[in-house]
């Protein structure tokens, strides 16, 4: 898409340069014409004229009254050299031989008589012509015509820019025009079938589609379709895709624009663009206006420090006016907006009559994730061992964009190994890469560091296996990825929407298992548990201040109002005293201390299993759920896994050789090796579940 735009932008720049060069050439030529005519005449003063007459150097003289002066022209008997000047210093001055002269004198009787006497005494032919007013106009035109030419060329240039750049894109003279991209709904290929994992959300939008197709049915019943639909939810859940599907199903014009496109540095531009957008939508009604990231323009007015009457607020005011009652005579314009920050939107924007319907587009459940995976796997050849349902169960909290990224990473891994199909191992690697980044198998680690990491992860696994409300341990690995040295993936047997206090307490104990695995075996503590401590502290504080799970403090909310604007809570006092703050800290420490003791008891009671899992991690690097359970119960690996060996990490040259093994001509092929060097910028650890622990 970008490649298609580059030639247009190149031609656009070339056209501008052509117009500028043409304007300069015309102005320069016009001035050169006048200056060349003027430079062919020797301009002299009255005293010089009298000297040349007395010196018998003049052939003839002509006197012509002009305004308040008399123009004296004539010819020399012999050409004289004069230094010419032009209006463009860069061209420099030049000298030339001229035969004509010109002088301006004051029309007094004495001056005229002196010239006549000098001409008569030297036999110089003297003639007088009638006064002419054309000289003044020629001089005026010499200044006006170049200016008019320049303005005309500039106007044509601006018109060409407007024709190519559209209403608000390339034309500087139309800042107030909307930058919305219009798409014909009849040619849109996106349908509700392309949106998976959002069945309830699609059902909410079916009425909007039906109204756009059959408005009479609703008008006859006196029903009013929602003037606006607000799609809110985390990034990557498919809000924009849902809006496109509505336009595709309804078959009406679709105007899409980002909230940031309304506001510019010039005053009044945002409000003007809002008016222009709705005027265009009304002309093609019924139609849909989609505003992506509406929080960029719809934030609360007067919020935070310096929240005065700025340009963004003027744009919001105009948007509020346009959205209030523009459905008349069946010509409906429906506004669909998307945001992941609905908490910062202005209340006037959310009231009934503007955004009547609010659709929460959240992360899909296991059934929805499986449906999303099936949609994204349509164009990917999957091997027979790939179970998309199993992949869906291992990706809680993943949204549509994350799931698409997992399959894409798996396809890249398979392509790197010259496979024809994507197998389960590729999917597993794709999940690891999407969550924690590429593996760093050739990272230099001492044996002691590897042992500490292995016992750390084994500690997480043991606590998760022992506790009743703990999640099922699905995977443990000590392969470094990004900034982490390893991780343990624990998932619940079924998705829990409302975890109990027992679930949270067991989760805290599982988070403590990593640090205890280091302390019990080696008697040391490493920074690898910093992420565990951070998450555990957040959960414990939420239990005390938000969930009311502390018997000492009771069911009281202490930190429920989190302001998002700078300065909004400045000067506001806390709703609890200093003594209560001390009690909150004491309760958080107590809950974390109890979790620490429970985790310590679980590991010390199962020291043999802890050691068996850690040694298996040092040997095999990665263990799945079946292997972990076998080690916990029998202390041994399953038979089919006992013979497996950990492959040595390949060098970049070896990977390049394998990738090019079946390629005849690879001179223009770039091979990407995701596991090549440890000094590459590590990817951030992507936390997908409260039960995942990463160090």
UniProtKB/Swiss-Prot annotation:
Domain of life assignment: Bacteria
Catalytic residues (positions): 457
Biased composition (Basic and acidic residues): 674-695
Keyword Disulfide bond: no
Topology, Extracellular side: 37-139
PROSITE patterns per UniProt: AAA
Residue ranges annotated as Cytoplasmic topological domain: 1-15, 161-695
Topological type in the membrane: Multi-pass membrane protein
Pfam families (UniProt xref): AAA, AAA_lid_3, FtsH_ext, Peptidase_M41
Annotated localization: Cell membrane
Purpose: Acts as a processive, ATP-dependent zinc metallopeptidase for both cytoplasmic and membrane proteins. Plays a role in the quality control of integral membrane proteins.
Record's subunit section: Homohexamer.
PANTHER family: AFG3 LIKE MATRIX AAA PEPTIDASE SUBUNIT 2, ISOFORM A (PTHR43655:SF2), ATP-DEPENDENT PROTEASE (PTHR43655)
Name this protein carries in UniProt: ATP-dependent zinc metalloprotease FtsH
């Amino acid at each position: 898409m970008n490649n298609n735009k580059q030639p247009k932008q190149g031609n656009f720049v070339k056209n501008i340069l052509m117009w500028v060069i043409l304007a300069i050439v015309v102005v320069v030529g016009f001035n050169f014409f006048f200056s060349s005519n003027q430079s062919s005449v020797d301009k002299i003063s009255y005293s010089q004229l009298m000297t040349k007459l007395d010196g018998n150097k003049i052939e003839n003289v002509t006197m012509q009254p002009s305004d308040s002066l008399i123009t004296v022209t004539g010819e020399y008997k012999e050409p004289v050299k004069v230094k010419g000047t032009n209006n463009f210093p860069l061209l420099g001055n030049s000298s030339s031989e001229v035969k004509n002269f010109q002088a301006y004198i004051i029309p007094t009787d004495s001056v005229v008589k002196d010239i006549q006497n000098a001409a008569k005494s030297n036999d110089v032919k003297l003639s007088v012509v009638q006064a002419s007013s054309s000289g003044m106009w020629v001089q005026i035109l010499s200044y006006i015509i170049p200016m008019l030419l320049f303005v005309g060329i500039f106007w044509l240039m601006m018109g060409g820019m407007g024709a190519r750049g559209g209403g608000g894109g390339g034309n500087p003279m139309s800042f107030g025009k909307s930058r919305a991209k219009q798409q014909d709904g009849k040619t849109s290929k996106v349908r509700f079938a392309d949106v998976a994992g959002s069945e309830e959300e699609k059902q909410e939008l079916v009425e909007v589609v039906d109204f756009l197709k059959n408005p009479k049915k609703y008008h006859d019943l006196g029903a009013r379709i929602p003037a606006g639909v607000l799609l809110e939810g985390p990034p990557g859940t498919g809000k924009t895709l849902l809006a496109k599907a509505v336009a595709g199903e309804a078959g009406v014009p679709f105007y899409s624009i980002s909230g940031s496109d309304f506001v510019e540095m010039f005053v009044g531009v945002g409000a003007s663009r809002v008016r222009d957008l709705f005027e265009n939508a009304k002309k093609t009604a019924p139609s849909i206006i989609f505003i992506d990231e509406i929080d960029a323009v719809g934030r609360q007015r007067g919020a935070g420090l310096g929240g005065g009457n700025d340009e963004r607020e003027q744009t919001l005011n105009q948007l509020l006016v346009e959205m209030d009652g523009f459905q008349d005579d069946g010509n409906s314009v429906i506004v669909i907006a998307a945001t992941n920050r609905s908490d910062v939107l202005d209340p006037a924007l959310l009231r009934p009559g503007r955004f009547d319907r609010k659709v929460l587009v959240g992360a899909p459940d296991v059934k929805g994730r499986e449906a999303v995976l099936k949609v994204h796997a349509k164009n990917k050849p999957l091997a027979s061992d790939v179970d998309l349902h199993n992949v869906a169960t291992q990706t809680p909290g993943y949204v549509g964009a994350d799931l698409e990224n997992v399959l894409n990473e798996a396809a890249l891994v398979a392509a790197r190994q010259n496979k024809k199909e994507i197998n389960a191992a590729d999917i597993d690697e794709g999940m690891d890469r999407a969550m924690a980044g590429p593996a760093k198998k050739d990272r230099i680690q001492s044996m002691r560091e590897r042992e500490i990491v292995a016992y750390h992860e084994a500690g997480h696994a043991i606590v998760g296996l022992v506790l009743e409300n703990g999640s099922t341990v699905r995977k443990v690995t000590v392969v470094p990825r990004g900034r982490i040295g390893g991780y343990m993936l624990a998932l619940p047997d079924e998705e829990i929407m409302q975890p109990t206090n027992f679930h949270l307490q067991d989760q805290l104990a599982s988070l403590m298992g990593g640090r205890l695995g280091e302390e019990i075996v080696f008697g040391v503590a490493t920074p690898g548990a910093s992420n565990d401590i951070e998450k555990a502290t957040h959960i414990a504080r939420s239990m005390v201040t938000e969930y009311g799970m502390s018997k000492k403090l009771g069911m009281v909310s202490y930190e429920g109002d989190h302001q998002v604007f700078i300065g909004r809570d400045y000067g506001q006092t806390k709703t609890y005293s200093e003594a209560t703050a001390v009690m909150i800290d004491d309760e958080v420490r107590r809950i974390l201390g109890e979790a620490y003791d429970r985790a310590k008891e679980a590991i010390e009671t199962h020291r043999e299993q802890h050691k068996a899992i850690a040694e298996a991690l040092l040997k095999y690097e990665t263990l799945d759920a079946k292997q972990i359970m076998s080690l916990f119960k029998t202390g041994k690996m399953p038979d089919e896994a006992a013979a497996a060996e950990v492959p040595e990490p390949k060098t970049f040259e070896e990977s390049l050789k394998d990738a090019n093994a079946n390629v005849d001509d690879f001179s223009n092929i770039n091979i990407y090796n995701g596991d090549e060097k440890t000094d590459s910028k590590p990817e951030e650890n992507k936390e997908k579940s409260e039960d995942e622990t990463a160090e």
